[in-house]
């Protein structure tokens, strides 16, 4: 049915979000070594404190700030991705339990009851637990919607901060042009930055899209199940 389809899609989106989260952290960790390579290149191309050295230092400082922010929502204990996954997983479990309890009640209403079981008492208990599962699932889904929105906002903020790194990267490319005869090592480092920047921005966009999809799925379920 429609509700089952929504649950399956939510679970699929959560798995994709976890994959993007892990890949994003790996890309950003790999990115941290490039400013060090730029400094090594600078030591061969210019006196201490030259433009390439300044570019590498500025890039390093900016990327560390972004890395700290990134880990606050996709890395470390209690991050936003983990919170969203936990709330949705909790809701999915409760919703599954609710559906099983509902089927048990329907089966009990249809089938003959053993003489040693008071079905009316059992039915009331099952119905009470079913309602509790529904209420707790709705609470978890509502919380999940809020966390998904926070994750989407944080992803957008990181993408904006990446524009600052893009500016520094462009300055590095300008220096490559100025040192075209001797800046081969610098050019290779900037090429690596190009690759990682594209990858990171793409994964941030994917996380934003997935968090919005998850949020929309939870809202749809709450509306249809009401």
Regions found by a protein language model. Give the residues of each.
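Acidic, heptad-repeat coiled-coil helices used for dimerization/signal transmission
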Residues: 1-226
């Amino acid at each position: 049915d429609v509700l089952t389809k929504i649950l399956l899609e939510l679970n699929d989106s959560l798995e994709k979000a976890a994959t993007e989260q892990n890949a994003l952290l790996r890309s950003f960790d790999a990115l941290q070594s490039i400013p060090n390579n730029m400094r090594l290149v600078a030591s061969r191309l210019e006196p201490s404190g030259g433009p390439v050295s300044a570019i590498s230092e500025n890039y390093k400082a900016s990327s560390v700030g972004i890395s700290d922010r990134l880990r606050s929502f996709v890395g470390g204990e209690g991050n936003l991705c983990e919170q969203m996954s936990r709330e949705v997983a909790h809701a999915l479990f409760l919703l599954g339990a609710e559906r099983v309890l509902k089927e048990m009640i329907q089966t009990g209403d249809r089938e003959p009851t053993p003489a040693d079981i008071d079905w009316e008492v059992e039915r009331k208990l099952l119905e009470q637990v079913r309602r509790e599962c529904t209420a707790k699932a709705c609470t978890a889904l509502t919380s999940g919607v809020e966390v998904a929105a926070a994750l989407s906002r944080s992803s957008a903020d990181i993408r904006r901060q990446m524009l600052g790194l893009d500016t520094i990267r462009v300055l590095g490319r300008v220096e490559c042009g100025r040192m075209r005869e001797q800046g081969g090592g610098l050019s290779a480092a900037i090429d690596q930055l190009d690759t990682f920047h594209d990858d990171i921005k793409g994964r941030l966009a994917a996380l934003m899209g997935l968090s919005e999809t998850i949020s929309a799925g939870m809202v749809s379920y709450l509306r249809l199940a009401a």
